[in-house]
Every structure is written in C-alpha cells, then in structure tokens.
C-alpha cells in the first residue's frame, strides 16, 4: 500500500507542471483488483489504501472491488467480456457474479449511464438455428 501511495503521489507531482500549460490532469480513480472475497488481510489492505488516499484531491479509490475469481482469466482466454462468461453468481460463493461487478464498476465510473448498465443482459443473444430440424436443436 505504501509503495502504491508513493508511486501515485510521485506520478501526480511529475505531471503537475503541465498545469502551467493549461493542461489539467484528469481525476485518478484507483481500482482494487483480484481481491480475495473472504480474506481478512485483503480487507485490511483495502481499508489501508482507502485511508491513505482519503485526503488527496483528485485521487479516489473506487468502492467497487474486482474479486479474484476464475471467471476473469476464463473470459480472457476465450476472448469474451467477463459479463458474458459469468452472469450469475455461483451457488455458495461469496463474491458476486462478474456481471454484477462490471455493472457496479461501470455505474461508479459513469453514474449518468447506470440505468443503461442495469439493462445489459449477461447472456449473449442466441442466434436462431433454422438449418436443423427442431428435434435436433440444443
């Protein structure tokens, strides 16, 4: 957490001179990725990061955390968006479905589009298969 803080603050200092040229740096949103959903240590680190950046103008730690679940590497391997790979939370798992996480993250970054994100279906549309008889379709 300290290394992230040091590096982030150094980056902000490095780009500060651009303000004199009229270039205002955009707000920085920090995403906590690959969070183990039931780890007490992960929760402590998350809270420490939030506390470290709480008073800094232009830096915000996002409230949405991306959990360390198998759906993300599986989606990457298949070349698909994760919300199409895991649209329902598996039974017995603490972490939310990837679709719910992506909706929360997108809504946090672009709150004016939250209703549109809520309408995104997780399941990809199924093409009509009219070449095979109905009895052979799956």
What are these regions (language model features)?
Residues 106-120:
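Short, hydrophobic alpha-helical segments
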Residues 130-138:
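Long, low-complexity, intrinsically disordered segments
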